[in-house]
Amino acid sequence: MTDSTFLDEITWTSDGLVPAIARDAKTGTVLMMAWMNRESLSLTAQENIAVYWSRSRGKLWRKGETSGFTQHVKSIRLDCDADVIVLDVEQMGGIACHTGRESCFYRELQNGKWVATDPVLKDPKEIY
């Protein structure tokens, strides 16, 4: 079992959360941003599988529990201000976004408009 004292070094929001950025461990591509609470970060550190806190559902969210696209955690990093987590992950199935794309950051600002630049790898209707 992991020693949980590392959790005390994090600067949590007033809601008891910390933003967590998941990126591909091999390519460095930013896949998504989600929130973690103490329990989800502790579980992630213990199991090496990404577990987040769903603010909309008010419960733990095991990434990939519905889609099968889990994130196997290779490393957990804390920024210099101790208020942002970065997870280096192996994204199972190559899809992190509920839109069926590799990354949730698939839109790019071009000439003042947001343009979808990354392809849909799988129709979300086939995933969920």
From Swiss-Prot:
It catalyses: 1-(5-phospho-beta-D-ribosyl)-5'-AMP + H2O = 1-(5-phospho-beta-D-ribosyl)-5-[(5-phospho-beta-D-ribosylamino)methylideneamino]imidazole-4-carboxamide. Pfam families: PRA-CH. It is an enzyme of class 3 (hydrolase). GO terms for biological process: L-histidine biosynthetic process. Keywords: Amino-acid biosynthesis, Cytoplasm, Histidine biosynthesis, Hydrolase, Magnesium, Metal-binding, Zinc. Its cofactor is Mg(2+); Zn(2+). It is found in: Cytoplasm. One of its GO terms (molecular function) is phosphoribosyl-AMP cyclohydrolase activity. Pathway: Amino-acid biosynthesis; L-histidine biosynthesis; L-histidine from 5-phospho-alpha-D-ribose 1-diphosphate: step 3/9. Binds 1 Mg(2+) ion per subunit. Binds 1 zinc ion per subunit. One of its GO terms (cellular component) is cytoplasm. Its main location: cytoplasm. Zn(2+) binds at C80, C97, C104. Gene3D superfamilies: Phosphoribosyl-AMP cyclohydrolase. Mg(2+) binds at D79, D81, D83. SUPFAM superfamilies: HisI-like. Its EC number is 3.5.4.19. Belongs to the PRA-CH family. Catalyzes the hydrolysis of the adenine ring of phosphoribosyl-AMP. Homodimer. This is Phosphoribosyl-AMP cyclohydrolase.
